[in-house]
Each structure stands twice: as C-alpha cells, then as structure tokens.
Amino acid sequence: MPVEAKAPDPLIGFSFGSRYQTDYNFRGVSQSNRQGSYQSFFEAQYFGGFAYTGLATYQTRLPTQPDMEFDLAAGIRPTFDKFALDLGVLYYFYPNEKRLLGPGGAFLTTANTDFMEYAAKGTWTATDSLTLGLNVFYSPNFLGQHANGTYTSGTAAYTLPANWFSFLPEAYSGGFSISSELGYYFLTAAKTSATGQIAFNLPSYLYGNVGLSYTYKNIVLDVRYHNTNLSKTDCFNFTGDYRGFNNGGTSKWCGDAVIGSITFQTSTAAPGIYAEPGGLLNLFR
C-alpha cells in the first residue's frame, strides 16, 4: 500500500483559547486587585508560523477603571535548528479609562495608560525536556507616563519524567513540567498630569516566578508563586493603587502571590481534545 502523503501546512493557521487566573499578575504586579481574571486570546499564523498577528483580552481592576486590557500583537518567529526567535511589537489598550480624582478635583492618576512595547525573545531547546529562554521588552512610553521601560528576563522550563507519576493511569502520567522566570524591570523618570508634569522616578525592581504545570491535550493547569523586591510604598508609587491614598501610601499588589490558572487552547495545527468525539467530556471518562 503506498504511503499516504502528508497534507501541506495551511498558509494561514489559527490558535485561540481562554484562561481563568485567580489573580492577573503582570511581571509581579496584580492587575486585578488580587481577584480572579477571565482572559481570551486569538492568533493567526502565516507562512508556516513564520509571521503572526494576535489579540488578547484581560479582565482588570485598575485605578483608572478601564473596561478591560485589550492587547494587539504582530511579529515574526524565525527558527534555526534548536534556537527560535520571536521578534514583535505589542500595543496595550485600556478602553474607557477614567481619571481618578482626589479632594478638590486633584488629579491622582493619568487619563490614558495605553502604551506600545517592542519584544525580542529567544528560546533554546537544550534537550527534549529542557528549554531555556532570554527575553527583552522595551517601551518608550511606559503606561503613557513618558518613561522608558525595559524588562529583561531569563526563563527555564523542564518536562518531568512520566515515570515519576507512575501511580497515575498511563494516559495522565505525562504532561507535568516545572518552569521559572527571573527578570528585572528598568524604569526611568515619569512625567504625568497627576504630578503637574514634574518628573518623578519610577522604582525599578526585581521579579521572579516558579511554578508547576500539567498539560492534558489542550488543557493546561498551572500553580505559580510570584514575588518582587518592591516595598509596599514603592508598590503604591508604581501602581497608583487607589487604596494607598487612604492608608498612608502603600499597596499589596506587588508582594508574594500564589496564583492558579486553567487554560483551554486549540489551533488548526493541533485541534486535540476539541476534535474528538465527546469533546471535553473525555476528561471525565
């Protein structure tokens, strides 16, 4: 019997999904007031995954009270054997923001925190189980505050051997992994309407996370510890957490956090559980 030829990759592929996190944490800082956040994402890939465009939405609870965070992204992903690059640009949009006002109408926040960021990410597949990465993100107008923001980080992800979980049914013993990130956010002086355009230094800070993930087909469960070296006072100066105006200028948005998440994702390249009879019900059989 002749070998059936593999179908060519589609010219345009798609990936989409949704996620729930017990706290939306962005580089160590809560964006949802330490509460849960529903999220969604969509990406189109072109020319076998070489180029992409995408969007994402995040439920937020921020001082300027936007309806959500809405992100747009575009870039390229060239690969060189075990090394892969992701070079792109992101735009963070916060629709229908409202300026937070204090007594007498004093400005406590800016009216617009939208900003653009340029990204360069590299990953190296050291072994079948270990992947290492380096990331650099740069914004010339971080949070619309006329400040430069540069975030650099290193990442590591390791797939745990399936035989470590031999007490589980064979179909579920694989898919466990641990991963971590260590980064530093370099921030310069900002000028905003809240300070009368007088420059003030945003606090640069160290950030790290480490977590355990479990992947079953298109479903990912993750529990992760996050922390920064920002003090509660620096956290307030950085975030403008509205409660800080009444508690002596402090915020808890940047401290220790253990966050859980569940993600559902599918794509035209790997439809996985969504393409099987019974769909998500297969998880419970």
Can you say where each PLM-predicted feature lies in the sequence?
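Outer-membrane beta-barrel "beta-signal"
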Residues: 154-160, 214-216, 250-285
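Membrane-embedded beta-strand positions of outer-membrane beta-barrel proteins
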Residues: 16-18, 42, 51-55, 74, ...
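Residues that define the transmembrane beta-barrel architecture of outer-membrane proteins
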Residues: 10-12, 34-38, 66-70, 83, ...
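Outer-membrane beta-barrel translocator domains and adjoining extracellular loop/strand segments
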Residues: 26-33, 63-70, 97-109, 143-149, ...
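Outer-membrane beta-barrel biogenesis signature
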Residues: 1-15, 26-31, 158-173, 269-285
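Transmembrane beta-strands of outer-membrane beta-barrel pores
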Residues: 20-26, 46-48, 55-61, 78-80, ...
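Repeated loop/turn-to-beta-strand initiation elements of outer-membrane beta-barrel proteins
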Residues: 48-53, 82-87, 128-134, 162-168, ...
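Short glycine/proline- and aromatic-enriched beta-strand/turn motifs that initiate or cap beta-hairpins
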Residues: 4-61, 267, 285
